[in-house]
C-alpha cells in the first residue's frame, strides 16, 4: 500500500513541494505544542494533591542532561510562581498557559491543513487534465476496445474516488506519523521500559489492520470496474433511446440496467462493510492496548520498583492515548488509500496507454501538396484479420477518387489510414513522395479536411462549430464559408444567427442542416485534401439538393477521397475503386466499369454503395 501511495506522490506532488514543507513545519509545531500542553497537567496534579514536596534551584544548560535541566527549571519556575503569588494564582497561570498553548496548537494544525488543501485540489485538477490530454492524444484505435461509458467513469468516478480517498487522507498521512513519532519520543523519555512493552503490542494490531486493507483494494477495483459498466449502459441507452422506443424494448433495457445496478450494489455493499470495519476494529484494538498498558504500568507502580511516578504515568497514558486517535485515523486513511489506489490502477490504464501513432523525431516539413497521394502495397489489420490487403493506389493532385464496395470491404479504413488515425502495418502511404510517417501529425492533418457520414458537431454556437480548429477566422470568412455550403439562409433564420447554440451534437438542427454546417467547417479550413464519407441517411428532396450542391462546391479543385453512397458523386469521380475483402478488385471511370460488366455494375444495379 505505502509503495503505491508514495509512487503516486512522486508523480503528482513535486510542483507543490513548498506546500508540503509548510505542512510539515506546522504539523511539527502542532505536535510539539500538544506535548507541551499535556506536560502542564503534571504540575497541576502535583499542586492539587500535594504530591511533590521537593525544593528546586535553577540549573544552567550543560550542568546536567538536557531532559533533567528542562524538567528541573520548569518546576523551579512553578515553585517561584507559587512562592510569589500563592498556589491558586499559580494554578490559574498554568491553566491559562494550557489554553494559550492549545490555541497555538489548533492554529498550527489549521495552517497545516490549509496548505494541504492547496495540494489536494491542485493534484486532482492535474490528474483530470492529464487524463483529458491523454484521451485527446491517444489514437482512435485505443477507443475501439474501450467502452465510452467506462472511459467517462475513469474521468469522473475514479478521479473523484482518488480525491475522496487518497487526497483527503493526504493530510492524515503527513500529520499522523509526525504526531505518533513525537509522542513515541516523549514516551521513551518518560519511561523507556514501558515503551518497549508498548512496541511489542503495536505490530500485532498493525498486522491485523493491514490484512483487511489488502482485501479492500481488490473489492474497490471490482466496484470501479462495475461502475464503468453501469455508465456504459446508461450512455448506450440515452444514445439509442429512439431505437429502444421504436422496438418496444423498454422492459429489456430496464432489466439489463437493473441487473448491472444490483451487481454494483452487491460489490459496493461488500466494500463499504469492509471499510466500516476499520473504525470499530481500530477502536477495539486501541482500547485493548490501553488496557494492557494500564495493567502493566500500574503493576510497576504498585510494586514500588518503577522508575516512573504516578503523575508521570498519568502523563504517559495521556500521551499514549494521544497516539491512539492518530493511529486510528492512520488506519482509516490506509483503508481509504487502498480504495483510491484501485481507482489509480484504472486511471493508469489510460495515462500509461501506449500512443502507437507517434511523431517522427525529425519531421519533414509538408505545408502543401503539389503532386498527389500514393498508396504502395498497403496492408492493415484489426487483430488477426487483414482488412486492407496489398492495396496500390495513386491519386493525382486535384483528382477525385470514389471508394465503393459493400459494408466491411475496407473503404473507411483505407481513408482513415491517410490522416494516420491508424498506421499501416506493411507498405506505405506518401504525399508528394514523402512517407506520411515522416511528417508531423499536425502538419499532415492540417492538409486535410474531414466531412463524416454523421455530422459531428459540438454543444456550442453555430459560429464556433464552423470555426472549430480555425480560431483566427474573420466574420467575413465564416459568412463566406456558410454561403458556399448553402448554410447561410437557415443560419440567419435561427433566433440568434451565427450565435445560436445548436444543442448537444446539434440536436436543435435537422439532419440536413447538421451536414451543411459540417461542410461549412471544412470549407473554412480550405484544405488541399478532402476526406468525405457521404451520408447515407435519407433527407428530404430539398435538403438532399442543398447538401449535394454544397459537397460539389467543397470538392471543386481539391484532391478528394470519397466513400461514395450517391451514384451522382460516383459518376463524376475521376477514378472509381471497387473494394472487396480489403482488396481493390476493379478500378476505372464509371463508363469503363459499367462496360466491364463486373462487380461495379452489380453494385450499381443493386444501388448498394
Report each predicted region and the residues it spans:
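Transmembrane helices of ABC transporter permease
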Residues: 19-29, 171-222, 295-308, 325
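Conserved catalytic Walker-motif region of ABC-type ATPase nucleotide-binding domains
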Residues: 135, 257, 347, 375
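Juxtamembrane helix-loop junctions of ABC transporter transmembrane domains
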Residues: 2, 33-42, 50, 92-93, ...
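Helix-loop-helix
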Residues: 186-200, 274-345, 350-351
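ABC-type nucleotide-binding domain
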Residues: 359-360, 366-609
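An intracellular "coupling" helix at the cytosolic face of ABC transporter transmembrane type-1 domains
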Residues: 12-18, 140-141, 157-166, 170, ...
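Membrane-integrated ABC transporters
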Residues: 1-39, 48-98, 104, 111-116, ...
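Alpha-helical transmembrane segments of multipass membrane proteins
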Residues: 30, 34, 101, 105-109, ...
Amino acid at each position: 500500500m505505502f509503495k503505491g501511495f508514495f509512487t503516486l506522490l512522486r508523480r503528482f506532488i513535486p510542483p507543490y513541494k513548498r506546500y508540503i514543507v509548510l505542512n510539515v513545519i506546522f504539523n511539527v509545531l502542532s505536535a510539539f505544542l500538544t506535548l507541551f500542553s499535556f506536560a502542564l497537567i503534571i504540575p497541576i496534579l502535583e499542586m492539587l494533591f500535594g504530591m511533590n514536596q521537593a525544593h528546586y534551584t535553577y540549573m544552567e544548560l550543560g550542568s546536567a542532561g538536557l531532559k533533567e535541566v528542562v524538567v528541573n527549571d520548569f518546576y523551579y519556575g512553578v515553585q517561584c510562581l507559587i512562592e510569589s503569588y500563592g498556589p491558586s494564582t499559580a494554578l490559574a497561570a498554568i491553566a491559562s498557559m494550557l489554553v494559550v498553548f492549545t490555541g497555538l496548537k489548533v492554529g498550527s494544525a489549521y495552517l497545516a491543513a490549509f496548505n494541504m488543501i492547496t495540494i489536494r485540489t491542485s493534484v486532482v485538477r492535474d490528474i483530470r487534465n492529464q487524463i483529458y490530454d491523454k484521451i485527446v492524444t491517444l489514437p482512435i484505435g485505443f477507443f475501439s476496445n474501450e467502452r465510452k461509458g467506462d472511459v467517462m467513469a475513469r474521468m469522473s468516478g475514479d478521479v473523484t474516488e482518488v480525491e475522496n480517498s487518497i487526497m483527503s487522507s493526504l493530510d492524515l498521512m503527513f500529520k499522523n506519523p509526525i504526531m505518533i513519532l513525537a509522542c513515541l519520543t516523549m514516551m521513551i523519555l518518560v519511561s523507556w521500559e514501558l515503551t518497549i512493552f508498548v512496541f511489542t503490542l503495536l505490530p500485532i494490531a498493525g498486522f491485523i489492520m493491514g490484512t483487511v486493507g489488502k482485501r479492500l483494494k481488490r473489492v474497490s477495483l471490482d466496484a470501479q470496474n462495475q461502475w464503468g459498466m453501469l455508465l456504459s449502459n446508461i450512455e448506450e441507452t440515452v444514445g439509442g433511446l429512439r431505437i429502444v422506443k421504436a422496438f418496444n424494448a423498454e422492459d429489456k433495457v430496464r432489466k439489463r440496467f437493473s441487473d448491472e445496478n444490483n451487481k454494483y450494489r452487491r460489490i459496493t455493499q461488500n466494500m463499504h462493510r469492509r471499510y466500516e470495519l476499520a473504525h470499530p476494529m481500530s477502536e477495539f484494538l486501541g482500547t485493548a492496548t490501553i488496557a494492557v498498558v494500564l495493567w502493566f504500568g500500574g503493576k510497576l507502580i504498585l510494586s514500588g520498583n518503577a522508575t516512573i511516578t504516578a503523575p508521570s504515568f498519568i502523563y504517559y497514558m495521556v500521551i499514549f492515548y494521544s497516539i491512539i486517535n492518530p493511529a486510528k485515523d492512520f488506519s482509516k486513511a490506509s483503508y481509504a488509500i487502498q480504495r483510491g489506489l484501485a481507482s489509480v490502477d484504472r486511471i493508469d490504464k489510460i495515462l500509461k496507454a501506449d500512443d502507437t501513432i507517434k511523431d517522427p523525431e525529425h519531421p519533414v516539413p509538408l505545408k502543401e501538396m503539389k503532386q498527389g497521394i500514393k498508396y504502395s502495397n498497403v496492408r492493415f489489420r484489426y487483430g488477426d484479420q487483414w482488412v486492407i490487403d496489398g492495396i496500390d493506389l495513386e491519386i493525382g493532385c486535384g483528382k477525385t477518387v470514389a471508394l465503393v464496395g459493400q459494408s466491411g470491404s475496407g473503404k473507411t479504413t483505407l481513408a482513415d489510414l491517410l490522416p494516420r488515425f491508424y498506421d499501416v502495418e506493411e507498405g506505405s502511404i506518401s504525399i508528394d513522395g514523402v512517407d506520411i510517417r515522416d511528417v508531423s501529425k499536425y502538419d499532415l492533418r492540417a492538409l486535410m479536411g474531414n466531412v463524416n457520414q454523421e455530422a459531428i458537431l459540438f454543444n456550442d454556437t453555430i459560429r464556433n462549430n464552423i470555426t472549430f480548429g480555425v480560431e483566427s477566422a474573420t466574420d467575413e470568412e465564416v459568412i463566406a464559408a456558410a454561403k458556399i455550403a448553402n448554410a447561410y439562409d437557415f443560419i440567419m433564420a435561427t433566433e440568434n444567427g451565427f450565435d445560436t447554440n445548436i444543442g448537444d451534437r446539434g440536436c436543435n438542427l435537422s439532419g440536413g442542416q447538421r451536414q451543411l454546417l459540417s461542410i461549412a467547417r471544412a470549407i473554412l479550413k480550405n484544405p488541399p485534401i478532402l476526406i468525405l464519407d457521404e451520408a447515407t441517411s435519407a433527407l428530404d428532396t430539398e435538403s438532399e439538393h442543398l447538401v449535394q450542391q454544397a459537397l460539389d462546391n467543397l470538392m471543386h479543385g481539391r484532391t478528394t477521397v470519397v466513400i461514395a453512397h450517391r451514384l451522382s458523386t460516383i459518376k463524376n469521380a475521376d477514378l472509381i475503386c471497387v473494394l472487396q475483402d480489403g482488396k481493390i478488385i476493379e478500378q476505372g471511370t464509371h463508363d469503363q466499369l459499367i462496360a466491364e460488366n463486373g462487380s461495379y455494375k452489380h453494385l450499381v444495379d443493386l444501388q448498394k454503395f
